[in-house]
Amino acid sequence: MITKRIIPCLDVKEGRVVKGIQFLGLKDAGDPVELAEAYDRESADELVFLDISASHEGRKTMTDVVEQVAAKLAIPFTVGGGINQLSDMKRMLRAGADKVSVNTAAVLRPELITEGADFFGSQCIVAAIDAKYDEDSDCYKVYTHGGRQKTEWEVTAWAKEAVSRGAGEILLTSMDADGEKTGFNHTLTQLVTRAVPVPVIASGGAGSARHMLEAFTIGEADAALAASIFHYKETSIKEVKDYMKKHGVNVR
């Protein structure tokens, strides 16, 4: 039986963890190094760090944070946000990240995925996809620039393209569900998990252990990502894992 992963996500802005709803209304949620250490102790399977500061200063802060976290973390972690070229990937991996996540830059220039996969291997490259239902075209469209810009890409078409170029994993966020805590978008998750042969991390909407269970049993995801429910201690990783075991889902 495949082992499912529980992954806390740290959205980092100006050196602090923040959380919003549908990518808006950001509130402070703590210190990234302290939170990372706590999640490591709680037996999280991995961590995802997303740098949502758009400035050059944000890049430097994030490199510092990654180095500090890497010094204390035993579990794998992925870093994304502002990774626009091979040199950005090198910097984050040198700082201690295990994987890098690419989003906007990869949609604008898909060769970035190929370059990263050729240089570091597919296991290091995560394609992060922000998707939202589009009524006009009756499909899920890919968004870039922190969810501000709609693209022409339909979500499964872009997921397949990213994987064909060497992405070893997909981090799929439902923009409609993000921060709402009403459950993952299983329709979207299942569409993508069935379209690609690589692991898919479901993101956006986790409000309870049951929601995370459903990401596996209904959405068919390989991993479930959550932020605010862990940051604000509404539940713990141990409680979520105990719930999974009770319902027959294999977790570490």
UniProtKB/Swiss-Prot annotation:
Transmembrane intervals: none
Compartment(s) of residence: Cytoplasm
Pathway participation: Amino-acid biosynthesis; L-histidine biosynthesis; L-histidine from 5-phospho-alpha-D-ribose 1-diphosphate: step 5/9
Main location group: cytoplasm
CDD domains attached to this UniProt entry: HisF
E.C. designation(s): 4.3.2.10
Highest rank taxon of the organism: Bacteria
Keywords, in A-Z order: Amino-acid biosynthesis, Cytoplasm, Histidine biosynthesis, Lyase
InterPro entries: Aldolase_TIM, His_biosynth, HisF, IGPS_HisA/HisF, RibuloseP-bd_barrel
Enzyme active site: 11, 130
Catalytic activity: 5-[(5-phospho-1-deoxy-D-ribulos-1-ylimino)methylamino]-1-(5-phospho-beta-D-ribosyl)imidazole-4-carboxamide + L-glutamine = D-erythro-1-(imidazol-4-yl)glycerol 3-phosphate + 5-amino-1-(5-phospho-beta-D-ribosyl)imidazole-4-carboxamide + L-glutamate + H(+)
GO MF annotation terms: imidazoleglycerol-phosphate synthase activity; lyase activity
EC category: lyase
Gene Ontology BP terms: L-histidine biosynthetic process
Record HAMAP family: HisF
Subunit record text: Heterodimer of HisH and HisF.
Function (record text): IGPS catalyzes the conversion of PRFAR and glutamine to IGP, AICAR and glutamate. The HisF subunit catalyzes the cyclization activity that produces IGP and AICAR from PRFAR using the ammonia provided by the HisH subunit.
Protein's recorded name: Imidazole glycerol phosphate synthase subunit HisF
Species this chain originates from: Bacillus velezensis (strain DSM 23117 / BGSC 10A6 / LMG 26770 / FZB42) (Bacillus amyloliquefaciens subsp. plantarum)
Source taxonomy: Bacteria, Bacillati, Bacillota, Bacilli, Bacillales
Gene: hisF
